[in-house]
């Protein structure tokens, strides 16, 4: 009886392993998908930088270039080398987002976009902020400064207990 249950378990295990091994999956590689998103982000950044958004409409990657081939979204290049799985139909059913909510770095202006130009001014203003306050007059500091000191204390970067902040 024990040999029969052991052999039936081994048979079920072998069947499950072989049934999963026969099926081959094909999908669009994540690298190609990320490259498309990065390319479209830079394209949108250039449009924002030139401020011609009214004349030129920038569209996110459309779903027409991707085909639903029962296993995911695939490019036309990837369709030539793909194999049909059949059983993994509903793994990827949501698709790509229609609009990217990411602001590209190229769209930023001023000191945020080019911090190297304003580096000297930022260093001087930081030094002035450090020289202004004493630790005895911590009420003059904004709340953010006291929170920062508390976080430094909690991280263990200073050699004093947290209640002395």
UniProtKB/Swiss-Prot annotation:
This entry's Gene Ontology molecular function terms read: melanin-concentrating hormone activity; signaling receptor binding
Which Gene Ontology cellular component terms are annotated? extracellular region; nucleus; synapse
UniProt xrefs under Pfam families = Pro-MCH
Cite the entry's keywords alphabetically: Amidation, Cleavage on pair of basic residues, Disulfide bond, Hormone, Neuropeptide, Secreted, Signal
Modified residues annotated as Isoleucine amide in this record: 143
InterPro entries on file: Prepro-melanin_conc_hormone
Q: In which tissues is it expressed?
A: Predominantly expressed in hypothalamus. Also found in heart, intestine, spleen and testis (spermatogonia, early spermatocytes and Sertoli cells). In brain only mature MCH and NEI peptides are present. In peripheral tissues a large product, encompassing the NEI and MCH domains of the precursor, is found predominantly.
| An individual GO BP term | neuropeptide signaling pathway
PTM comment: the record says: Pro-MCH is processed differentially in the brain and in peripheral organs producing two neuropeptides; NEI and MCH. A third peptide, NGE, may also be produced. Preferential processing in neurons by prohormone convertase 2 (PC2) generates NEI. MCH is generated in neurons of the lateral hypothalmic area by several prohormone convertases including PC1/3, PC2 and PC5/6.
Q: Where in the cell is it found?
A: Secreted
Q: Which cysteines are joined by disulfide bonds?
A: 153-162
**Where does the record place the region Disordered?**
66-89
Leader peptide range in chain numbering: 1-21
Family note: Belongs to the MCH family.
Function, in words: MCH may act as a neurotransmitter or neuromodulator in a broad array of neuronal functions directed toward the regulation of goal-directed behavior, such as food intake, and general arousal.
The record's section on PANTHER family has:
MELANIN-CONCENTRATING HORMONE, PRO-MCH
What's the protein called, per UniProt? Answer: Pro-MCH
């Amino acid at each position: 009886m024990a040999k029969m249950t052991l052999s039936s378990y081994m048979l079920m295990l072998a069947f499950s392993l072989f049934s999963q091994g026969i099926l081959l999956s094909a999908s669009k590689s994540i690298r190609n998908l990320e490259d498309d998103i990065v390319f479209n982000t830079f394209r949108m950044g250039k449009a924002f930088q030139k401020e011609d958004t009214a004349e030129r409409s920038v569209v996110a990657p459309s779903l027409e270039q991707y085909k639903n081939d029962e296993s995911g979204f695939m490019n036309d290049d990837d369709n030539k080398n793909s194999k049909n799985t059949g059983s993994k139909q509903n793994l990827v059913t949501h698709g790509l987002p229609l609009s990217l909510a990411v602001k590209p770095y190229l769209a930023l202006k001023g000191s945020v976009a080019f911090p190297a130009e304003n580096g000297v001014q930022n260093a001087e203003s930081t030094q002035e902020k450090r020289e202004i306050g004493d630790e005895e007059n911590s009420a003059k500091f904004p709340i953010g400064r006291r929170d920062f000191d508390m976080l430094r204390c909690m991280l263990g970067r200073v050699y004093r207990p947290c209640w002395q902040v």
